[in-house]
Amino acid sequence: MLDFDAIPRIDIALGGLLPQKRTMLLIDSARGTAGSVVASETTLGSRHELFAQRDGTFGSWILLELMAQTIGIYAGLKNRAEGSGPKVGFILGTRHFDARVPFFRAGDTIRIRGECIAYFESDLPSQFECVAYLGDAEVGRSRLTVYQPKDLTAFTHDS
């Protein structure tokens, strides 16, 4: 069970930590520590319509994006401590993504707990263990390998 309230609240606007535009910023609130744990919360609704299925439910794969944005908050806090702003990161892969429910409904509040297993400030990928909760029930789990390039232009087309 996730004791969400035991994790200190982050009093920084999420737009100051994540590079997504408001239309793609899926998380409502975040919590984190000076250590290796970060957590987020979101209530599913119309702004998550990109992930909606024809019947109005949200496929369990939305958990991967919520986990990725939670990890982005962790990276955003690190970047902010170093004096820089939000940076784009990539999911390189996932191990053992286990969704315990096939879908979610509008109004469901999902909480994500991410723990940094390995964080590299050099040009290496990092790993996070993430767990998703709906109420007290664990509804998903994954280990994500992520990468935040120092120079994003090395991965984009020349202008």
Residues covered by each model-derived region:
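Short Pro/Gly-enriched beta-strand edge/turn motifs at strand-loop
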Residues: 8-14, 111-113
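Single-stranded RNA-binding regions, centering on S1/OB-family and related RNA-binding modules
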Residues: 1-11, 41
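HotDog/MaoC-like acyl-thioester-processing domains
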Residues: 2-4, 73, 106-111, 115-159
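Short coil-to-beta-strand transition motifs
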Residues: 18-26, 104-111
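Beta-strand-rich interaction surfaces with strong enrichment in secreted/lumenal proteins
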Residues: 15, 29, 54, 99-103
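Hydrophobic beta-strand-centered segment that forms part of the acyl-chain substrate-binding groove
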Residues: 73-113
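Catalytic strand-loop segment that frames the active site of acyl-thioester-processing enzymes
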Residues: 22-59
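Compact, glycine-rich, soluble single-domain proteins
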Residues: 55-74, 88-92
